[in-house]
A protein has these predicted regions:
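Short hydrophobic short-linear motifs embedded
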Residues: 10-13, 18, 26-28
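A cross-kingdom signal targeting lumenal/periplasmic-facing segments of multi-pass membrane
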Residues: 141-143
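Asp/Glu-centered strand-loop micro-motifs enriched in Gly/Pro and often flanked by an aromatic residue
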Residues: 91-100
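Short active-site oxyanion
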Residues: 113-117
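A short acidic, glycine-rich active-site loop
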Residues: 306-316
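A conserved beta-strand-loop-helix scaffold within acyl/acetyltransferase catalytic domains
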Residues: 32-90, 119-139, 149-301, 316-330, ...
Length: 359
């Protein structure tokens, strides 16, 4: 099977299907019993971590451990992570549970009747929410996944990777993995001043740099001599109590080093993970990158707005630049969706921007 065919038939599947993990669903009687014990923020940290490690196969499952989140917890099944904004619930990522329990836990979660929207959910969950609960599920980006087993630096589109690696070597840049470096926050403060959304970090859709729970994260740094030039934090992606992938969720770089070191630092980390036997590498979300064709459960109005934002909104956020950067790694793009009740969810969009610290 060639690489593109393999990507189409394998990489667009959930991680549990890719890895072959088999987890039996809870019997129906047990589901009903556990539903009576469901509640908000019921699990202890250890209990939540146990579900995360078993079912946290979405690239944002770990990010949903960020401060300020609430959780709809169903003992024996799993949880849904969300935040409140202006009286509505905003879910981040797929439910952390077995695939077979998704419909049940979403149904229980929606029973309180509060306005609810879903952000950065996978295509199977988006389709489920549309078909079973009457939501619009609209694509709002792609997530890129790289198969490390077949990945290398060959090919025309990877020329920029090879060039950046050669330049870093020539300039005496060295890379290292460390647990913590004291200059992280200082470099972050300097980096934020150069961003289009200045002097504040994007939240919710991107987890904060400092988390109360960071077990399993990996940090890679770039130096020239003793000068810290940049770093990337990688969060683990789990399935059946094993790390099956990593995703870069925090990256910061010195504005004093114009040549750029994101590419060579990423390649260094990817080669490290590959040497450890890791099969996949998630590159995370490229927002506003959507198909030209609308699915039957998408809002055509929202989809059109997203296309226009990608085309004309780069003065607010570098949508095109981010997608171009990730495309150089030649991974497979998987659709990412938001789900909303209204055909034109203006309040939900404004609430999401507020949650994300953009407004």
């Amino acid at each position: 099977m060639n690489t593109s065919a393999q990507a189409t038939t394998v990489l667009d599947l959930p991680v549990r299907q890719i890895t072959g993990a088999k987890i039996l669903p809870l019997p129906l009687r047990g589901r009903i019993r556990e539903a009576h014990n469901a509640g908000i923020d019921k699990f202890s940290l250890d209990e939540r971590i146990s579900y995360l490690r078993r079912y946290g196969d979405h690239c944002m499952s770990f990010s949903a451990m960020q401060p300020g989140m609430h959780y709809f917890d169903v003992p024996g099944i799993g949880y849904i992570a969300y935040k409140m904004q202006w009286g509505s619930k905003f879910v981040l990522a797929d439910p952390v549970c077995d695939e077979k329990d998704r419909e049940f836990i979403i149904s229980e979660f929606l029973k309180d009747g509060k306005g609810t929207a879903f952000a950065q959910i996978s295509e199977p969950v988006a389709e489920l929410i549309a078909e079973k609960f009457g939501y619009y599920s609209t694509q709002f980006g792609v997530e890129t996944i790289v198969d490390l087993e077949d990945w290398n630096l060959k090919g025309k589109k990877k020329q920029v990777l090879r060039t950046s690696i050669n330049k870093a070597q020539k300039d005496g840049i060295h890379f290292i993995e460390k647990d913590h470096v004291n200059g992280d926050r200082k470099l972050t403060d300097e980096w934020l001043k150069t961003r289009k959304v200045r002097n504040r970090e994007i939240l919710f859709l991107i987890r904060p740099m400092d988390m109360d729970y960071e077990e399993g994260t990996r940090r890679f740094y770039a130096y020239k001599g003793d000068e810290l030039l940049g770093f990337i934090y990688f969060d683990p992606i789990y399935s059946d109590n094993k790390v099956v992938s990593y995703v870069p969720n925090i990256s910061r770089f010195s504005h004093n080093f114009k040549q750029g070191i994101f590419y060579p630092l990423m390649v260094y980390a990817m080669e490290t993970f590959k040497s450890e036997g890791l099969r996949y590498m998630h590159l995370g979300l490229s927002p506003m990158v959507v198909d030209d064709k609308d699915l039957y459960y998408e809002s055509s109005i929202v989809k059109k707005m997203i296309r226009l934002l990608y085309k004309y909104g780069n003065m607010v956020y570098s949508f095109k630049g981010l997608h171009f950067t990730k495309s150089r790694f030649q991974g497979t793009d998987c659709k990412t969706f938001c789900a909303h009740k209204e055909k034109l969810p203006i309040k939900s969009f404004l609430s999401m921007f507020k949650l994300a610290n953009i407004l």
